């Protein structure tokens, strides 16, 4: 009697914005996405994969920026740049590099549109929201805040966590964009979006990378927020206008 050999095929793709499909014994099962259904995906060709990596600090991060198609293969890999978020905003579509703009600042935590809010450089606060809300992306390693754009179980990093990562680069390329890319995080020169709405990336001669943190600036400039900046000659944490668009790299909590 012939033996029938059953081959069990398990396909386990886990993408942000899609369902996790498992084909097991001929049955299709699905697991909900780790992102809410109103989390806007900027590119219909792909969904951002949620893959964990452990850095030299021992912390677990996503292996790519939110909105990135792949892990960076070089510092200037455009497929790894990802989206550009205004500090504290939800993933409503404003983070898409080709999103429209409007000049009316918001008085609520979640604007009812998907435009990048343009703020004049003469603004007193340089923020897309008035009055400001310092807790939109969480405080002190909390779960992420009301507008946390990261998947379930992840949040924006604190300034201390960003600083620890930067300091860990010393042995793998230095506290520069070289160290940023040589690290397990493979941080690319993702560019940024000015508060005027202009997108500046490496291709336009702007070889900079910025990663938002969840912390706001101190008493020296309380209207700003903290971010990690890195380029060919240096890397550091600094105060930046909340109306600017920077990349987001999520850390696990």
Residue ranges: model-predicted function:
Residues 83-99, 103-113:
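Glycine-rich, aromatic-lined ligand/substrate-binding cores of catalytic
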Residues 19, 103, 111-114, 130, ...:
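Positively charged, low-complexity intrinsically disordered regions
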Residues 4-13:
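Sec-dependent N-terminal signal peptides
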Residues 47-49, 54-94, 118-253:
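C-terminal, surface-exposed recognition/capping segments
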Residues 15-47, 249-253:
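Enriched but not universal
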Residues 29-32, 54, 105-106:
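Intrinsically disordered, low-complexity segments enriched in Ser/Pro/Gly/Ala and basic residues
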Residues 11-12, 21, 25, 30, ...:
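Generic detector of low-complexity/intrinsically disordered segments
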């Amino acid at each position: 009697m012939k033996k029938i050999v059953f081959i069990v095929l398990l396909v386990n793709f886990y993408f942000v914005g899609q369902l996790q499909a498992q084909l097991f014994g001929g049955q299709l099962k699905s697991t909900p996405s780790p992102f809410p259904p109103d989390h806007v995906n900027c590119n219909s060709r792909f969904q951002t994969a949620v893959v964990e990596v452990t850095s030299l600090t021992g912390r677990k991060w996503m292996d790519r920026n939110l909105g990135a198609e792949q892990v960076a293969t070089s510092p200037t890999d455009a497929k790894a740049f990802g989206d550009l978020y205004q500090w504290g905003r939800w993933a409503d579509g404003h983070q898409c590099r080709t999103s429209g703009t409007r000049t009316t600042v918001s008085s609520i935590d979640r604007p009812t549109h998907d435009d990048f809010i343009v703020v004049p450089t003469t603004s007193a606060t340089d923020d897309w929201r008035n009055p400001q809300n310092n807790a939109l992306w969480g405080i002190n390693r909390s779960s992420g805040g009301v507008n946390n754009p990261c998947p379930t179980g992840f949040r924006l990093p604190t300034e201390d966590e960003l600083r620890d990562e930067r300091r860990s680069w010393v042995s793998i390329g230095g506290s520069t964009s070289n160290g940023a890319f040589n690290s397990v995080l493979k941080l690319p020169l993702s560019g940024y979006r000015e508060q005027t709405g202009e997108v500046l990336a490496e291709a336009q001669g702007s070889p900079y990378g910025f990663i938002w943190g969840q912390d706001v600036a101190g008493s020296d400039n309380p209207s700003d927020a903290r971010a990690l900046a890195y380029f060919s000659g240096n890397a550091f944490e600094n105060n930046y206008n909340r109306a600017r668009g920077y990349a987001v790299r999520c850390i696990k909590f």
